[in-house]
């Protein structure tokens, strides 16, 4: 895109994660399993479920890698992301499609002192990262990307982008969630049509009171649906997952889940009740209205 101004677009494979074609990017931490199969068939065994090659996850949430595409096509700014510190600081390898496993979070309860990585996406010439005020160094940005080794320490991560003359251009932060933990549920539709074919996608997350998602550790969330609607699906964006999507409980992935509610063919209200051990239950009500007839 930088070298050829006549380019007007880019084909991304894939934009969004999908079921099947398991582990197309061949993500692995360490060596491939040793067996008689071709290399491209190893490391994809059950319970691998998703292709895990998109820049939007299965629930429709953009992943940090999407910022690199934005910058390549003329965008400006700075974003940062961190690896969940449960891999002993190992950087995964990929055959294609992906290049990092970091997420836009700095909330990893129980991981104090464990090694991690912090990624910076920016069109600045150089980037510097601070963890609770301590600099991790300053490095040139190559192809809109810079990577910093770190040890997890609850608090705040600050990334600063500089131009070629050393002047500050951007800054951005990630903060650790506070101690109080709640369930949140946000439907993309706040009313449905009573035709049996209308859906509301409810984004569910474990957060603090300020809305910062608690991405680790994971929790099992239970769901109950009654009234003028049914549960069409309930699951996470976890690419390695043996849990079903048609059950009334599921484990979060990076603190998130999604429930899909189908309207009934009769008007009324559909009630969605969510619960998890140690957390206050949450109930949301979605009106289901008769379709307007012209």
PLM regions and their residue ranges:
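Short, conserved beta-strand segments of beta-strand-rich sandwich/propeller modules, principally
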Residues: 154-158, 201, 269-271
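Solvent-exposed beta-strand/loop surfaces of large extracellular or lumenal domains
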Residues: 133-143, 231-250
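Short, hydrophobic beta-strand segments
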Residues: 147-152, 246-265
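Substrate-binding clefts and catalytic carboxylate motifs of secreted carbohydrate-active enzymes
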Residues: 1-197, 209-213
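Short aromatic-acidic-glycine turn motif
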Residues: 180-184, 223-240, 292-294
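Short beta-strand elements
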Residues: 170-179, 279-294
